[in-house]
A protein has these predicted regions:
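Short, solvent-exposed loop/hinge segments that bridge or flank secondary-structure elements
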Residues: 23-62, 95-112
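Edge beta-strand at a domain terminus
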Residues: 123-150
């Protein structure tokens, strides 16, 4: 009875044995698309929690699940090999604001090279007016992070 109890107590530790955390330091560049004077570069440290089924990067969750409601669409992907991790998040929503049909789109793409300990992460945030047959970009924000992880 005691060996079974000990195995049951140790089982959670065995199932999380592939999980680990990284701290990545690098250069983050932010700017408004089409406005070169808005470019801002800072040194930043981000945390990453890696799991077999997904990862949390700077507060954002990446896995292979999708979520579709009447209000929004969220599609995520996460692929982990022994050498690399690639992940993506695509979020979109539509809203009627002051009689205009506004679409908000957020796209994140992450590449982590485990062997070289480096990361490249891009984030795009777009707000588009879809009221007329022509799309008008209201706001287009870009952010990229390139760094080294430990």
């Amino acid at each position: 009875m005691k060996p079974i109890l000990i195995l049951l107590l140790l089982f959670p530790l065995l199932s999380f044995s592939d999980d680990f955390e990284l701290l990545c330091k690098g250069e983050e560049t932010k700017y408004l698309h089409g406005e070169p004077n808005s470019k801002e570069v800072t040194i930043k440290v981000i945390g990453i929690q890696l799991y077999e089924e997904g990862m949390r990067l700077d507060g954002e969750w990446f896995d292979n699940k999708s979520d579709l409601t009447e209000d929004y669409l969220l599609v995520r992907s996460y692929v982990k090999t022994k050498d690399n991790i690639t992940a993506a998040r695509n979020f979109s929503t539509n809203a009627l604001i002051e009689g205009r049909e506004i679409q908000t789109i957020k796209i994140d793409k992450v590449e982590i090279n485990i062997l070289a300990n480096d990361i490249f992460w891009t984030h795009e945030f777009n707000r588009v007016d879809k009221t007329n047959s022509q799309l008008n970009t209201i706001y287009a924000f870009r952010k990229s992070f390139k760094g080294t992880c430990k």
